[in-house]
Amino acid sequence: MHLSPQEKDKLLIFSAAQLAERRLNRGLKLNYPETVAFLSFQVLEGARDGKSVSQLMSEGTTWLSKKQVMDGISEMVDEVQVEAVFPDGTKLVTIHNPIN
């Protein structure tokens, strides 16, 4: 199987996001890498589902709360930027202050 660097990155994000989701389901708080992976994966999947950049930027602030992440993580993650593939091409999605 031959994967491009971007495809390898997406698989890594998927694996980390899956781990993060399992930990959330068990009631554990997410650390920094898990938080970024979880948010990034939501953007990638939203783009795949046909959502617009503006929809993802708006929804992105509702995916995680401060209660779901370790202390200090919400201050560390002031924005998340993800290049996602949309039907009309690749676009950069930026979510400002994603953890409320």
Swiss-Prot record:
It catalyses: urea + 2 H2O + H(+) = hydrogencarbonate + 2 NH4(+). It comes from the Bacteria. GO terms for biological process: urea catabolic process. Keywords: Cytoplasm, Hydrolase. Pathway: Nitrogen metabolism; urea degradation; CO(2) and NH(3) from urea (urease route): step 1/1. The keyword Cytoplasm applies. Inhibited by HgCl2 and acetohydroxyamic acid slightly by EDTA, but not by boric acid or L-methionine-DL-sulfoximine. Its EC number is 3.5.1.5. It is an enzyme of class 3 (hydrolase). Belongs to the urease gamma subunit family. This is Urease subunit gamma. It comes from Prochlorococcus marinus subsp. pastoris (strain PCC 9511).
